[in-house]
């Protein structure tokens, strides 16, 4: 009778202990699947943000793709204002010529 009682207690303990291991494995599997789902959601959010940022950059580049930076005029080039001339050149009429158009010339000294 004692032997049967011992086996009964051992079988009950084994069954309850085995169930806890299975429950723990199920919890770990659920947690890992949840963490994978969270990672996938985070990845999708990051991809959406990246697409939005790079999309804006591409739109700006598309808008300005035909725009070319204005070049400055060198010495002796015709100009309309000082901003048209490179560096420290002045946009002024050359008194030594009969042409009325201003040119990029060296600044007056003094």
From Swiss-Prot:
Cellular compartment(s): Secreted
The keyword Secreted is assigned to this record: yes
Chief subcellular location: secreted
Keyword set, alphabetical order: Disulfide bond, Ion channel impairing toxin, Secreted, Signal, Toxin
One GO CC term, this protein: extracellular region
Superkingdom to which the source organism belongs: Eukaryota
Signal peptide positions (record): 1-18
GO molecular function: ion channel regulator activity; toxin activity
Disulfide bonds: 72-86, 79-91, 85-104
Tissue/organ expression: Expressed by the venom gland.
Keyword Disulfide bond: yes
Domain notes: The presence of a 'disulfide through disulfide knot' structurally defines this protein as a knottin.
Role played: Probable ion channel inhibitor.
Record-given protein name: U12-hexatoxin-Hi1a
């Amino acid at each position: 009778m004692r032997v049967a009682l011992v086996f009964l207690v051992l079988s009950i303990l084994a069954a309850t202990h085995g169930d806890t291991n299975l429950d723990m494995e199920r919890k770990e599997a659920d947690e890992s699947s949840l963490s994978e789902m969270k990672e996938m959601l985070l990845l999708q959010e990051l991809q959406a943000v990246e697409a939005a940022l790079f999309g804006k950059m591409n739109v700006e580049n598309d808008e300005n793709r035909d725009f070319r930076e204005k070049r400055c005029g060198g010495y002796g080039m015709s100009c309309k204002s000082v901003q048209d001339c490179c560096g420290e050149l002045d946009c002024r009429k050359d008194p030594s010529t009969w042409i009325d158009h201003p040119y990029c010339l060296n600044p007056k000294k003094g």
